[in-house]
Amino acid sequence: YGVSDVVDSWGEKAYLPISNELNDFFRTGLTSITSVSVSHGNEKLQNYFSYANTTGKGIIDKNRLSKHNITFRETSVIFNNRLKLDGNVNLMRQVSKNKPTVGGFYMNPLVGLYRFPRGEDLSYYRNNFEVYDESRNLNIQNWHTAYEDFEQNPYWITNRIQSKETRTRVILSLSANFKVNDWLTIQARGNMDYWADKLRQKFYASTATALCGANGRYVEMDYQETQR
């Protein structure tokens, strides 16, 4: 098990101790949330404001998250307490960089990690995940065997397959409640939900051909929707 004369992780029984290369690939994740809120008012008017910031560092290198949330709400009572107005605004912006692939083979660094021969030194491919190709005049992926569509150098995936996802969302709501008399009340409400998603991906040349062409690939996608 784990000798270097095979292309996958299974082989003859090893005679030398080996290190746990998987632990060297992962790191400790960290999530930090900072928030502040302010409220003020009297019997006629109330205001509320809050802001929250979330930052995250994933267990895989290059994975980052940044999120901002703003909430503002105001309620008021006018016309001798007969009309009540309530307005609410929520703003959110989130940026996620190099989000890991969930399951599957493509763009999943775990496939290469678990199939890597245990008798070889993974640190070499960490420090030399790309090598210069004189015929193409550029750096190309370096792996212990001819990389397949579903198995690539995990450090190539984290460094040379880059993505950025951005989401902006705005939620608005407004309600008005008018008391005509003791037995009749009229109410009107309105809502709007808008969001915009953007995706940017870069695949460097020599990434598996199932994902891109020989010279790499650039993906740009925009999506917007409004619901009322």
Positions of predicted regions on the chain:
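Surface-exposed loop/interface segments of Gram-negative outer-membrane beta-barrel transport/assembly proteins
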Residues: 1-19, 59-63, 69-171, 187-228
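Outer-membrane beta-barrel initiation region
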Residues: 8-9, 24-29, 35-42
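Transmembrane beta-strand segments of Gram-negative outer membrane beta-barrel proteins
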Residues: 19, 44-51
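Short Pro-Gly-centered flexible turn/kink motifs
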Residues: 30-32, 227-228
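Outer-membrane beta-barrel channels and translocator barrels
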Residues: 31, 42-43, 78-81, 179-181
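Outer-membrane beta-barrel architecture
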Residues: 35-39, 50, 73-75, 173-175, ...
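Transmembrane beta-strand segments that form the barrel wall of outer-membrane beta-barrel proteins
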Residues: 51-57
